[in-house]
Amino acid sequence: MNPIVKSFEYGQHTVTLETGVIARQADAAVLASMGDTTVLVTVVGKKEAEAGRDFFPLTVNYQEKTYAAGKIPGGFFKREGRPSEDETLIARLIDRPIRPLFPNGFTNEVQVIITVVSVDPQIEPDIISMIGTSAALAISGIPFSGPLGAARVGYINGEYVLNPTVTQLESSQLNLVVAGTESAVLMVESEAQALPEEVMLGSVVYGHDQQQVVIKAIAEFKAEAGKPAWNWTAPVANEALVAQVKELAEDGLAQAYQIQVKQDRYAQVAVVKAAAKEALLAANPDVDLREVDGLLGSLEKKVVRGRIIRGEPRIDGREPDMVRALSVLAGVLPRTHGSALFTRGETQALVTCTLGTERDAQKIDSIMGERTNRFMLHYNFPPYSVGETGMVGSPKRREIGHGKLAWRGINAVMPTAEEFPYSVRVVSEITESNGSSSMASVCGTSLALMDAGVPIKTSVAGIAMGLVKEGDNFVVLSDILGDEDHLGDMDFKVAGTRDGVTALQMDIKIEGITKEIMEIALQQAYGARVHILNVMDQAIGSHRDDISDHAPRITTIKINPEKIRDVIGKGGAVIRALTEETGTTIELEDDGTVKIASSNGDATREAIRRIEEITSEVEVGRIYNGKVIRIVDFGAFVNILPGKDGLVHISQISDERVANVSDHLELNQEVTVKVMEVDRQGRVRLSIKEAQTKEAAAE
């Protein structure tokens, strides 16, 4: 074994790339390290493409092994299972920038597997996974227009920070990941604390500049360790067939794309394509219909893009900077804690908000440690939203990714646990879709949270921008349709408030996207965002003054931390009885904070009364109503507070001489007693006759 190693400094860390020792039967394998965080990246590609395949089957699998953090998995089987949400999101983060770097027409199956084998709790594994993937693809010989660089950018005390640690991110106003080639930014994913557009743009430029050291190092690594390039050539276009398809379908497609209603347009496009195929089959029964489908798709793209570049109206008749018609409704469902229906053109989201207690929060145990997520946002994309049939079940990668993007857009305005002691779950059901459903989810979530009475700092809206670029000519599009996303060169999603950006996601399919284009897109997005916020604020401009009658109300009280064990009781018996008998949910914290949750005010008050009884101290000289719980020869034990008993000596039962305690008292008898003394050991001395004397004096 002859290892080839490349090391370089990158921000605060040393990055090492190594190949030639592990997984030598893969087309490429790289052990990539950043500090103590290490990933094994393998790449395997099939040498032959499946006949007739018209798509590129790229699979990216990212897996975190618990042994990397010195842990044993939980659960019955004690081994890793299905991918977690974090693993799915990082797999998408790696997939998005590498996919456009494979050549058009390349349909060989390629699988990339990233395995986290060691983790430093201060260095997240996503950036080194992207770097390792870029290096493995670069040396594999598979056609790939890399290398690719990746960087995380923070913003702390007004300065950009390259690859901040986990601790630094806690005080950062920005968490941005940018990936790109030497000359172009390809992907951006970020979460921010309502930062100005110029700060966001600056962070993208900064991250791209800093990652040049990665790109250079991988190029040097490839020169030393690279395998011979595959003998692959792009399929040659059948120019005669291209001309025939153009003649048969171009005019029909141009007319079909004048139809503004999506379903009607799709129906007419299908008619035009079917007629073209029928004519081609009549002329040549051996024509390859898959090839024809590809050519029709390319022609469709050319027709739509040409109209936009020429300054003609968009597919639905809008100008480039126009937002589709908006409909905003809050409080649309009677029993949910909060709800909203947000409609933008043919995209619609029904969003609900549910409030719960702290124990309803999501508990995540990952290789980076345990954490609790009080705010959850789930995005569902059922097939009926686009007029199709399909499988319904667990969320797909796309749904998880869109939900996380919407979560990032909203998280910056969420209240702290001290301000609002509830767990919050939002669900966005996409009921119609024609582009930008994730940004519709952001808008709907903001509305539903306000309807639920969640004190978010301000309204948040999201908008998806697009781009069509031909040579030096380009047009930036606001509020793109699904077709414009599919046929365009950029998908640029921005969520934010009136004051700044809270989330930015960008996927670019071509090179040549300049800082000027990104700046125009951000400014155009700001105008669209403010327009949407104005409409949203007309429906509900601030959060409701109170939460729903159907939501649990959380009341917080403080007790002496030393009394927590009394509230819990032996084996949890006391708190279990409290919750069952009052119908409340009770949560205790180590500092003595007690949170009582119930939708019934009387139940809450009863729980508070009983907790105060349990935790109150016995006061010398005070009169208590108690119950006889045990009789002995020398007196009786009386319970005066939950868990607090005292002794009434035989001499303190009556002013008369008492020969036999049982002649005066019986078990479970209610008596009035006065506390005479509490000794150093906490023993309580009670008196019935002193209590009677005090009561008589009071009368």
UniProtKB/Swiss-Prot annotation:
Mg(2+) binds at residues 485, 491. Pfam families: KH_1 (PF00013), PNPase (PF03726), RNase_PH (PF01138), RNase_PH_C (PF03725), S1 (PF00575). PROSITE patterns: KH_TYPE_1, S1. It comes from the Bacteria. InterPro entries: ExoRNase_PH_dom1 (IPR001247), ExoRNase_PH_dom2 (IPR015847), ExoRNase_PH_dom2_sf (IPR036345), KH_dom (IPR004087), KH_dom_type_1 (IPR004088), KH_dom_type_1_sf (IPR036612), NA-bd_OB-fold (IPR012340), PNPase (IPR012162). Residues 621-689 form the S1 motif domain. Its main location: cytoplasm. It catalyses: RNA(n+1) + phosphate = RNA(n) + a ribonucleoside 5'-diphosphate. GO terms for biological process: mRNA catabolic process; RNA processing. One of its GO terms (molecular function) is polyribonucleotide nucleotidyltransferase activity. Residues 552-611 form the KH domain. It is found in: Cytoplasm. One of its GO terms (cellular component) is cytosol. NCBIfam families: polynuc_phos, PRK11824.1. Belongs to the polyribonucleotide nucleotidyltransferase family. Component of the RNA degradosome, which is a multiprotein complex involved in RNA processing and mRNA degradation. HAMAP family: PNPase. Involved in mRNA degradation. Catalyzes the phosphorolysis of single-stranded polyribonucleotides processively in the 3'- to 5'-direction. This is Polyribonucleotide nucleotidyltransferase. It comes from Shewanella sp. (strain ANA-3). The gene is pnp.
